[in-house]
C-alpha cells in the first residue's frame, strides 16, 4: 500500500516528537492571567491554555526565529530556496515541548512546510518573500503586536465547549480578534488551531 508523502512525513514527525519528549473573573468575558508558568493548573482550563501559550510564544518567539527553516537565497542568489527539514524537526520539537499544542497543530504545521516546499520546487525562487511564509506561521498574521501588548486586556467574544472540544473567539485591546480551537487530552486542553478574524464582527 502506498503512503503519500504528506502522510509519511506526518508519521515521522509524530514518532520524533513522541520520543523526545488567571483565572476568569465573574464578568465572563474578561480574562486575568495569574502567572506564566507551564503548570498543570495553567492548562486545566481553555482560557488559561490559550493565554499560557501566547505568553510562552511571546517569550520564545526570538529563539524560534533563530532556527532557519529555509536554505538558499540571499546572499547566494544562485541557490534557490528550499526547506531545511532537519531545522523544521527542531522547530516543531521546541513547539511541542511547550506543552500547549496538540499533535494536530504540529502535524498541520508540518504539512504546511511540505506544501510550501513543493511550491518552491514547482516555482523556484531565490529572492523575496516566500508564499506561505510571508506571515507568522503560528499567529497566522503579519501584524499581531496588539496581542503582545494586550495580554492583560482580553475579552471573550464567543465561547463553545462541547465535551473534549472547545472554541473561543478572543479580542485583544478592543481591536485584534482571533479564533482558537482546542481539544482536551488527559484532562488538559491543547491548542489545535489559531484562525484570525478580520471580519470586524463581534
Task: Cite the ranges covered by each PLM segment.
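Flexible low-complexity loop/turn motifs enriched in small/helix-breaking residues
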Residues: 23-161
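Glycine-centered tight beta-turn/hairpin loop motif at sheet-sheet or coil-to-beta transitions
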Residues: 173-175
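C-terminal motif of bacterial Sec signal peptides marking the signal peptidase cleavage site
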Residues: 17-18
